[in-house]
Design a protein with these regions (language model features):
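Rossmann-like NAD(P)H-binding beta-loop-alpha module
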Residues: 143-147, 152-227
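N-terminal glycine-/serine-/threonine-rich beta1-alpha1-beta2 phosphate-ribose binding loop
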Residues: 1-116
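C-terminal catalytic/substrate-binding lobe primarily of soluble NAD(P)-dependent oxidoreductases
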Residues: 2-7, 200-471
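Short acidic, glycine/serine/threonine-rich loops at helix termini
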Residues: 55-56, 136-139, 162-165, 186-192, ...
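Rossmann-fold NAD(P)-binding glycine/threonine-rich loop
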Residues: 104-120, 128-156, 166-167
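Short, ordered loop/turn segments at secondary-structure junctions
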Residues: 46, 105-106, 128-132, 155-156, ...
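Short gly/pro/ser/thr-enriched loop/turn and capping motifs at secondary-structure boundaries
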Residues: 49-50, 131-136, 140, 157-161, ...
């Protein structure tokens, strides 16, 4: 694809507003100074000083950064060509920006920002996977009803993987699985017997016995590696959350609620994430999964990249491609096609430009709620306690995440993970049980709840939504 031709629209650059100036927002602002067809002059964070600092760090002229506390101040600064920093989207959403990038990572705040952007007639780029996992299809439906676009963003794995899946489908490939590498690699130094992952180093000399796949059964070596590194985390909520977004865009499903998540070397992935009939782990096709990249210190990472596993229907062609270095399974039946990157805000502009210039999303044409991310208690959770969301990965202590088929909210239904986050339990949840909507106290004015009810009404029918409104 020639991107210059794709975005060849004769008009002024697209003006944007980014809400949330953490890693993604900051990288978006930095690249925004360099994208010819886009401007990134407006930043919002919980403290305007944080937004201003992010603008300065991005390379904006400090003399042109204005901290604005009213809509009038913001309007004056924007008209003068200055950079605008604010502590509330409501102060700046009336500026002549075309796309709001929601990158806070906070589901309740993100729901409010989504509503404000759509009500103001702005396209929405949803970076916050926590928000998307609860009500992404509903937000897209709401935006489309107003002639607007809600889109995931290139730079994050969901949009990149949706692009790779649809590329493969366009070319007629038979897709067995799609996924991404996990948040962190497992880097094994065979000389010392040490494994490093996510800043932790553990002695695991036994892993040397499981370094090579060879002719071993997929399930056996995956189990052996998992046992060897049992001291290190092997599941991360963000992985499941991101794959949910892909599932809602493509209809792909998880093979098991917590994913297989094998620890695998890059060359092994098409062997392990193949059907059981082909010696792999999967019970069907069009499955979503993740792998933990096992590598030596001097080997390249998969870098949180995305992949599809496809069937090799023409063996001579794939034998030729394998000889050229493409990653083909040990029996030659499947191959992995992949993008070993996700550049966060540095490559998000393509999604922003698609929304503003072309009126299309980088995700599904019309996403549907196929999956829900839910929480299962890993310990007894007493009534009256709060399901506090915290940490870099926005986890909830005492729970683990799972992917299940999406349903409308009801007291008996499992509560979406990030709808339950920061809610108080009204009754004890025993270890091993899914947390249900009836277990939690949701603030009646929750904007996230309102968006989810809208989604349920749009996709599961007014009767289901009415039941939720009465009982949730």
């Amino acid at each position: 694809m020639n991107f210059h031709r794709y975005f060849n629209v004769d008009r002024p650059p697209v003006e944007t507003c980014v809400v949330g100036t953490g890693d993604f927002g900051r990288s978006f602002l930095t690249q925004g100074l360099r994208v010819p067809r886009m401007r990134a002059r407006v930043a919002v964070d919980r403290d305007a000083q944080i937004a201003a600092a992010a603008l300065k760090a991005s390379g904006a002229d400090p003399e042109r950064i204005r901290i604005c506390t009213t809509a009038a101040e913001a309007g004056k600064a924007f008209a003068a060509g200055d950079f605008v920093a604010a502590d509330d989207l409501a102060l700046v959403v009336g500026l002549p920006v075309e796309v709001v990038i929601e990158a806070t990572g906070h589901p309740e705040a993100g729901a409010r920002h989504a509503r404000l952007a759509i009500e103001a007639g702005r396209h929405l780029a949803v970076v916050s996977k926590e928000l998307d996992s609860v009500a992404g299809p509903g937000i897209a439906h709401m935006a489309a009803a107003r002639g607007l676009v809600s889109t995931p963003v290139d730079g994050d794995q969901p949009s990149l993987l949706i692009g790779l899946v649809t590329w493969a489908e366009t070319l007629g490939f038979e897709i067995i699985a799609a996924g991404k590498s996990s948040e962190y690699d497992f880097v094994f130094d065979r000389a010392t017997g040490l494994v490093t992952s996510n800043g932790r180093t553990e002695p695991v000399p036994a892993l040397a016995d499981h370094w090579e796949l060879g002719g071993r059964a997929a399930a056996e070596i995956v189990a052996s590696r998992a046992e060897a590194v049992a001291a290190l985390p092997q599941r991360a909520v963000p992985d499941l959350c991101e794959l949910l977004i892909v599932g809602n865009a493509t209809g792909f499903a998880a093979d098991r609620p917590d994913l297989h998540a094998p620890i695998a070397r890059i060359t092994e992935v098409p062997t392990l994430l193949a059907g059981k009939a082909e010696g792999g782990l999967l019970s069907g096709e069009r499955r979503l999964d993740v792998f933990h990249c096992l590598r030596a210190p001097d080997e390249p990472s998969f870098a949180g990249g995305v992949f599809v596993i496809v069937r090799c229907t023409d063996r001579p062609t794939w034998d030729m491609l394998a000889a050229k270095g493409h990653v083909v399974s040990r029996d030659g039946a499947t191959a992995m096609l992949y993008l070993p990157r996700h550049l966060l805000g540095l490559e998000a502009a393509t999604s922003v430009l698609e929304a503003a210039l072309l009126g299309v999303s980088s995700g599904a044409v019309a996403p549907r709620p196929h999956l829900d991310l839910v929480a299962r208690a890993t310990q007894d959770l007493p009534a009256g306690s709060t399901l506090a969301m915290g940490g870099h990965h926005h986890t909830i202590d005492g729970t683990t995440a799972e992917l299940v088929p999406a349903v409308a909210l009801s007291p008996e239904a499992a509560a979406p993970f990030y709808l339950a986050a920061n809610c108080r339990l009204v009754r004890t949840v025993e270890c091993g049980r899914l947390i249900t909507v009836g277990d939690i106290e949701i603030a009646p004015d929750s904007e996230l709840l309102a968006l989810r009810r809208y989604q349920d009404a749009a996709f599961f029918g007014a009767t289901a939504a009415g039941k939720v409104a009465e009982n949730a």
